[in-house]
Amino acid sequence: MVSADEGVAVPPKLPLSYRLCRRFYRFLTNIWFREINIVDDENLPNEGGILYITWHPSGLIDPMLMMSVLPGQLTTVAKHTLFRIPVLGRLLRASSVVPIERPSDSKDLGASRQRNADRLSSLSSLISNGASVLIFPEGVTHADAGVRTVRSGAARILLAAIRDAKENGRPLPKFVPIGLH
């Protein structure tokens, strides 16, 4: 967005629910962590969509931390069963979290795959239109020392976003890996 009187790009105002959730998450992460260091944040892309990927060692702390420190509005991907938990489900929706169905959590695999394909398509569209999306490509939280097997969703989302951006003359989306430790 560009201000008419100054010709300077002005970021859009974030939705109130998102701003309140971010403030709450920052409060929690400030209690949880003694210190948060961000390295090379000056290298974050300033145009085009972004797909952030990171491993998932600490359950709900990881997305809260990412939402606390990353700029702009972040759409995060989470397993759909979390949305069934009454208070948490409302908080996730207010935080711009998108549910994804894991095959192990679905009774109707065909319908689950179709819903996920639709969600992956909408996520790639968001990215190709300049939004930021966070995904945990292992698909599970764990405390292992190394990375588990990575699922294909992140790659499919990014490839579709790049294809869409090229077809529509928009800036190419970027891929930003994040290390948590």
Give short role names for the model-derived ranges:
Residues 1-3, 93-94:
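Short, compositionally biased low-complexity segments
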Residues 2-12:
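Short, Lys/Arg-rich, polar N-terminal cytosolic tail immediately upstream
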Residues 11-181:
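Soluble catalytic domains of membrane acyltransferases
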